């Protein structure tokens, strides 16, 4: 993205009016939807193989060529199975859509950087990009909250809404014509409902273009929500100060203090902490609050009316469930991490003086559990164990050397430790046991010996030591301290904020 920005270092007031006409000029109007598009689909004489990294110059040349010939490029052998997008990566339309997404990302990336500078989180933005940052948010916030709701962000019911929403952000008519063309040629515009199958195919065939449209839609969705939240916070401060003045007023009148404590305490508790905590992961969002369940209901209807009025999305109130966190465990799927989050209560007893009474303090602790059953199912699919979780050998790896076999299993254990280190250790040890025993059975199968004979012939403790010392070696590189500190860190839970992608632990065969 940086290599494109250096050509476009313009004043922001001139950027929207200058950017797209400069790159594409008037040729985009030649791509406007018309009846000729469906009639003039014939094949070019040659198949030009472009590089996957398309540039703005290639996109401009392609648009010029399409404008001059007034047709879309489809190849003969793919014409029966391809629509406008197709599955052939050499299609000109594929390159144009990718270049379109690149051009559109430039102004929005600048808006993101400016918003991060205003919020003062530029330095910690890399940590926020991690897929594990949501767990640190849970540990910091959810132990103090009581009600939560897991909401799926709905897709727009009609893709024309995306075009109209984009028109408010970028006032460029050629750009809107091009965007409308892509959406028009991909799906049937006579249908008012975008089906899940169409969206799934769209996201697979043009991931960058789809991610741009989806991120733009979510950005528009969250900007209005944050505006409402900010206004609600402002009202909270004003109301809070008013009630404090009433406290001071009634405190001066001694005979009204008791009346105030009976009649106004419940009202004051509502204004104690009405803030809504919001976090988004994948296509879902979570909003939670400390108390006042009717405040959560108010925000639920905010979402419903907002979707109806702004995006024409009809949603039923029963689709948004408000749960109490202290009674129900919280299940969610994020970045390939199927997790079960629950709150455990621990009692801490303290004694200030020898003759004083004991004080019991109940503390809430967030517990993240490794999903054992889905992991065992994945290990069984990769032939490391059977469906019951009993380790088996890996026959396809017996042709490799002993060092390569051990290294492959160590890599799996390392990925598991790195990815699930912030969760329960007990569940993680059970998964590692399957991998370690599968490694020993694979080596015994290679040397054509039984498991018992192989363990007698080979020093099993030396073999398994590499598995146990691997995590300590990793921690020693991160925390170069005493061995006691390393042992404490080995037993503790650590979330690594350098993980930006989903786990690929099992797909190593």
Curated annotation (Swiss-Prot):
Could you mention a single GO BP entry for this protein?
A: RNA splicing
| Annotated organism of origin | Stylosanthes hamata
Example of a GO MF term: RNA binding
By what name is this protein known? Answer: Maturase K
State the family named in the UniProt similarity comment for this chain: Belongs to the intron maturase 2 family. MatK subfamily.
The UniProt entry, under InterPro entries, shows: Domain_X, Maturase_MatK, Maturase_MatK_N
Which UniProt keyword terms apply here? Chloroplast, mRNA processing, Plastid, RNA-binding, tRNA processing
Q: Which Pfam families match?
A: Intron_maturas2, MatK_N
Query: Which cell locations does it reside in?
Result: Plastid, Chloroplast
Q: What does this protein do?
A: Usually encoded in the trnK tRNA gene intron. Probably assists in splicing its own and other chloroplast group II introns.
Q: What is its main location?
A: plastid
Q: Which GO terms describe its cellular component?
A: chloroplast
């Amino acid at each position: 993205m940086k290599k494109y920005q250096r050509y476009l270092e313009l004043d922001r007031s001139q950027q929207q009016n200058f950017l797209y006409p400069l790159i594409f000029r008037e040729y985009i109007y030649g791509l406007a939807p018309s009846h000729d598009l469906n009639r003039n689909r014939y094949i070019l004489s040659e198949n030009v193989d472009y590089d996957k990294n398309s540039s703005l110059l290639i996109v401009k040349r392609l648009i010029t060529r399409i404008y001059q010939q007034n047709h879309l490029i489809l190849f003969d052998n793919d014409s029966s199975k391809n629509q406008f997008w197709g599955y052939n990566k050499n299609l000109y339309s594929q390159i144009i859509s990718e270049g379109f997404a690149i051009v559109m990302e430039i102004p929005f990336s600048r808006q993101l950087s400016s918003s991060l500078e205003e919020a003062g989180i530029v330095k910690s933005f890399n940590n926020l990009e991690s897929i594990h940052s949501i767990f640190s948010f849970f540990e910091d916030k959810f132990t103090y909250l009581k009600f939560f709701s897991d909401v799926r962000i709905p897709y727009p019911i009609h893709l024309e809404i995306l075009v109209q929403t984009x028109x408010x952000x970028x006032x460029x008519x050629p750009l809107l014509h091009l965007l409308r063309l892509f959406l028009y040629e991909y799906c049937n515009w006579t249908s008012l409902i975008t089906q899940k199958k169409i969206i799934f195919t769209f996201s697979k065939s043009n991931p960058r273009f789809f991610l741009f449209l989806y991120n733009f839609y979510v950005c528009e969705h969250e900007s209005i929500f944050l505006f409402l939240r900010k206004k609600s916070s402002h009202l909270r401060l004003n109301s809070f100060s008013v009630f404090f003045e009433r406290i001071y007023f009634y405190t001066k009148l001694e005979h009204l203090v008791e009346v105030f404590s009976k009649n106004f305490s419940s009202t004051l508790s509502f204004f104690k902490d009405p803030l809504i905590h919001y976090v988004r992961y994948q296509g879902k969002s979570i909003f939670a609050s400390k108390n006042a369940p009717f405040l959560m209901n108010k925000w639920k209807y905010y979402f419903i009316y907002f979707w109806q009025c702004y995006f024409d999305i009809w949603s039923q109130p029963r689709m948004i469930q408000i749960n109490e966190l202290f009674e129900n465990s919280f299940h969610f799927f994020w970045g390939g991490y199927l997790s079960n989050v629950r709150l455990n209560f621990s009692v801490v007893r303290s004694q200030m003086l020898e003759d004083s009474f004991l004080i019991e303090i109940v503390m809430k602790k967030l517990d993240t559990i490794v999903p054992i059953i889905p992991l065992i199912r994945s290990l069984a699919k990769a032939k490391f164990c059977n469906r019951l979780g009993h380790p088996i050998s890996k026959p396809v790896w017996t042709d490799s050397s002993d060092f390569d076999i051990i290294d492959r299993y160590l890599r799996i254990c390392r990925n598991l430790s790195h990815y699930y280190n912030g969760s329960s250790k007990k569940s993680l040890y059970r998964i590692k046991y399957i991998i370690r025993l599968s490694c020993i059975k694979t080596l015994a199968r290679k040397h054509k010996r039984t498991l018992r004979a192989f363990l007698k012939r080979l020093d099993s403790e030396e073999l398994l030591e590499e598995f146990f010392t691997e995590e300590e070696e990793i921690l020693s590189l991160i925390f170069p301290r005493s061995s006691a500190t390393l042992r404490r860190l080995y037993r503790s839970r650590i979330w690594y904020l350098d993980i930006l992608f989903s786990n690929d632990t099992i797909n190593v065969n």
